[in-house]
Amino acid sequence: MRCPYCGGLDTQVRDSRPTEDNTAIRRRRICPDCGGRFTTFERVQLRELMVLKRSGRRVPFDRDKLARSVDVALRKRPVDGERVERMLSGIVRQLESMGDSDITSQTIGEMVMEGLKQLDDVAYVRFASVYRNFREAKDFENALAELSQPELAQSDDVKAEGGAEGGRDKPKAAGKPPRSAE
């Protein structure tokens, strides 16, 4: 594997172990040329997915782009990285098992929103504000109302699949208690 620091091609694996959820292999590598250390992940890819954008363009699915958009929504939020990784892996598994290699960006966005709703309310609203292109304060109010009434925002596809995390994490409460403004 090419070294991200110096471009050397002769990197060596120092440590290799499965991730906590056993969906990938984490490898620590070192470059003998520059001494740089970095981590790589090896994952199974069941099929080559293509994303159908709103503009009609088809682009290859990029898990890293999905992870970056989720990271932006979760920036400075107290959410464990392993939970985020489980959510992302669950979404990718769902996409790969849908049986179609062409997936709409809307389908991906709805799955991410459902996953974020279960991880962190603030991240959910942040992601929704970009994904749904909020223009005014009323849009935020509607998103907050969806959080207090979880059944309104779920798509039927995601509900049928058991949520973006495959239903493995905590069961969802019927409703969230109101928060005090402290």
From Swiss-Prot:
GO molecular function: ATP binding; DNA binding; zinc ion binding
Cofactor(s) the protein needs: Zn(2+)
Compositional bias per record (Basic and acidic residues), positions renumbered to this chain: 12-24, 156-172
Cofactor detail note: Binds 1 zinc ion.
Stretches for region Disordered: 1-24, 146-182
Pfam families per UniProt: ATP-cone, Zn_ribbon_NrdR
Zinc finger regions, unnamed: 3-34
Keyword list, A-Z: ATP-binding, DNA-binding, Metal-binding, Nucleotide-binding, Repressor, Transcription, Transcription regulation, Zinc, Zinc-finger
Single biological process term from Gene Ontology: negative regulation of DNA-templated transcription
Positions of the ATP-cone domain: 49-139
InterPro entries per record: ATP-cone_dom, NrdR-like_N, RNR_NrdR-like
Domain of life according to the entry: Bacteria
Family: Belongs to the NrdR family.
Task performed by this protein: Negatively regulates transcription of bacterial ribonucleotide reductase nrd genes and operons by binding to NrdR-boxes.
HAMAP family cross-referenced by the UniProt entry: NrdR
Protein name: Transcriptional repressor NrdR
Encoding gene per record: nrdR
